[in-house]
């Protein structure tokens, strides 16, 4: 990766985990510090971050980390749903044996994950596999920000909920296992079931927020920092 790509990766990771919290207004100096880079690579990275919806242009106030929004999450899921269904269909037809072996190994690992941080990492790996095994770089590039911002929403809105690891795993494992068998119908069905679950999760968060009069959750992982 060049310096601009490194800056993009650092900033997206910090936005996803809440280290740069939802709604934060960031100056160029703050972004340079967070990205651990210089002004030129940062400005190149910022153009991409705005295009990919990781940052919002804030006029003279600086750049803003997008607030957590149920409407935005549902819009992302509408697009991601179709792209991931396409991805698993392509993977069943195109993935080579080495790629399928990597998926099978990941499924075995996913079954053993117990704590939330390890599960978060496993979800990220699941998303990476869904992008790469389709062997279509345009599809992969489209999925990167959608998956990352969806993970941010999930982290911010489900932290502390019981059985969240088991609930998510119950959808990822069948979809990925179907890919290892090259069963495109089952893989697509698994992905669509996952997205039904994610949409319900977003709506459940909206209902909880309305009941408690809260419009935005605290930043994920903020406790103990």
Please give the residue ranges for each predicted region:
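C-terminal all-alpha effector/ligand-binding and dimerization domain
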Residues: 156-225
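Secondary-structure transition/hinge residues
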Residues: 15, 19, 91, 95, ...
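Short linear motifs at protein or domain termini
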Residues: 1-93, 203-225
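Short helix-capping/turn signature of helix-turn-helix
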Residues: 29, 147-148, 194
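C-terminal regulatory/oligomerization modules of transcriptional regulators
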Residues: 124-126, 133-158, 200, 214-225
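Short amphipathic alpha-helical segments at helix-loop
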Residues: 23, 27, 68, 111, ...
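All-alpha effector-binding/dimerization core of bacterial HTH-type transcriptional repressors
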Residues: 52, 66-135, 141, 145-148, ...
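Juxtamembrane/interface motifs at transmembrane-helix termini
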Residues: 43, 94-97, 122-123, 140, ...
